[in-house]
Amino acid sequence: MRKALLISLILPILIGGLVAAAQAPQDTPQGFMGINIGAGLAVGLAAIGAGVAVGTAAAAGIGVLTEKREMFGTVLIFVAIGEGIAVYGIIFAVLMLFAGI
């Protein structure tokens, strides 16, 4: 079951990158080096990682908040750290597409 879920999450990202790479002219950096596929993988895998991190941190945070309401700020910081993973993936993808890394 988990293999099917993982494949169903990754397959649309790969297909989208392949379609974008096929439409780009071959003389541009995006079409020649497959940067579109790399950018799609960067965003997709970072979003999956952020989802896992936020889900785990939020579940633990709810448990903490039921016992100690004053820990809200700390829980919010831990959940925000998990969201940072997705932001880094988006930044890296933009750098790949426009700076030609």
Swiss-Prot record:
CDD domains associated with the record: ATP-synt_Vo_Ao_c (cd18120)
UniProtKB keywords: ATP-binding, Cell membrane, Hydrogen ion transport, Hydrolase, Ion transport, Lipid-binding, Membrane, Nucleotide-binding, Transmembrane, Transmembrane helix, Transport
Residues annotated as transmembrane: 4-24, 32-52, 75-95
Membrane topology term: Multi-pass membrane protein
Subcellular location: Cell membrane
Highest taxon of the lineage: Archaea
Gene3D superfamilies in the cross-refs: lithium bound rotor ring of v- atpase (1.20.120.610)
MF terms (GO), sorted A to Z: ATP binding; hydrolase activity; lipid binding; proton-transporting ATPase activity, rotational mechanism
A GO-annotated cellular component: proton-transporting V-type ATPase, V0 domain
Pfam families, per database record: ATP-synt_C
Quaternary data: Has multiple subunits with at least A(3), B(3), C, D, E, F, H, I and proteolipid K(x).
Family recorded in the similarity comment: Belongs to the V-ATPase proteolipid subunit family.
Described function: Component of the A-type ATP synthase that produces ATP from ADP in the presence of a proton gradient across the membrane.
Record protein name field: A-type ATP synthase subunit K
Native source species: Sulfolobus acidocaldarius (strain ATCC 33909 / DSM 639 / JCM 8929 / NBRC 15157 / NCIMB 11770)
